[in-house]
Amino acid sequence: MNATPSRAFVAPSTGIVIAAFAALAAGDGLALRLNEPAGRVVEPLAARGQKATVLFFLTTDCPIGNRYAPEISRIVRDYQARGVTSHAVYAHETAAEVTTHLREYQLSLGAVLDPELKLAKFTGATVTPEACVLSPAGVVLYRGRIDDRAVKLGTVRLEPTVRDLRLALDAVLAGKPVVEKFTQAIGCYISPPETSD
């Protein structure tokens, strides 16, 4: 597994944002095919009657992300019955590492392996943990923190004062626009894939 350096959130570069919006306009993201840890190929953004899709960008070794595991499982449970599909997205882990992580942290959602960062590029996600809410048409409706419990690296509140992801999901499910579409996620930087020279 590649080490993932811990850094505060940095806004995605203009190039990534432009590429993400170009992909959205072309609808390319909906046909993304990725492997689950068990090897099955899935299309995490394909519309199958759900009202929204949530992508949780995670790594196995990010302390902030691991602290969020119970809340991620609660969100998955609370919104699944309301028509929301959720996936954990891992960029640099092996299938075995992801399976172990899901079990050890009792994360109750499906996972996909994304070594080429296709979903991160598509959505603009740059850190873990970061959440993205997408419409059935593949439009990013929300991207950012799960809540405001992580204030900065090394500073975490006991309880959040704003539950951003839940607010976004509630708005989407009520047919209303998301008020705060982008928030600053705090966590571990998603490093680009290593290339062989």
Language-model features, listed with the residues they occupy:
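Short, thiol/selenol-centered motifs that function as redox-active sites or metal-ligating centers
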Residues: 59-70, 131, 188-191, 197
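Structural recognition of the beta-strand scaffold that forms the well-ordered cores
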Residues: 55-56, 86-90, 110-112, 143
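Structural microenvironment flanking redox-active thiols in thiol-disulfide oxidoreductases
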Residues: 66-105, 113-122
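Short active-site neighborhood of thiol/selenol oxidoreductases, capturing the structured segment around
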Residues: 47-66, 169
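A short beta-strand-turn-helix
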Residues: 32-53
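Bacterial N-terminal signal peptides that target proteins for export
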Residues: 2-16
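Thiol/selenol-based redox catalytic cores and closely related redox-interacting motifs
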Residues: 116-195
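Bacterial Sec-dependent signal peptides at the C-terminal "C-region" and cleavage site
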Residues: 19-31
